[in-house]
């Protein structure tokens, strides 16, 4: 059986990256929430 995690940095950035977060309203809400919580890393 194939494992579920098949690392791929390009896909990682496209799905979870900063620019993809900024491109939608809900993504911006995610970043705002993480800033408020005090996360050192906001996105992948």
Swiss-Prot record:
MF terms in GO: structural constituent of ribosome
Region described as Disordered: 1-27
Protein's UniProt keywords contain Ribonucleoprotein: yes
One GO cellular component term noted in the UniProt record for this chain: ribonucleoprotein complex
Compositionally biased region (Basic residues): 1-19
Gene3D superfamilies reported in the protein's UniProt record: 1.10.287.3980
GO biological process, alphabetically ordered: translation
Keywords: Ribonucleoprotein, Ribosomal protein
HAMAP family reported in the protein's UniProt record: Ribosomal_bL34
Subunit structure and binding partners: Part of the 50S ribosomal subunit.
Database matches in PANTHER family: LARGE RIBOSOMAL SUBUNIT PROTEIN BL34M, MITOCHONDRIAL RIBOSOMAL PROTEIN 34 FAMILY MEMBER
Family listed: Belongs to the bacterial ribosomal protein bL34 family.
NCBIfam families: rpmH_bact
Protein's name according to its UniProt entry: Large ribosomal subunit protein bL34
Organism of derivation: Bacillus subtilis (strain 168)
Lineage: Bacteria, Bacillati, Bacillota, Bacilli, Bacillales
């Amino acid at each position: 059986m194939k494992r579920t995690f098949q690392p791929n940095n390009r896909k990682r950035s496209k799905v979870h990256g900063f620019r993809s977060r900024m491109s939608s309203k809900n993504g911006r809400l995610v970043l705002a929430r993480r800033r408020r919580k005090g996360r050192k890393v906001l996105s992948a």
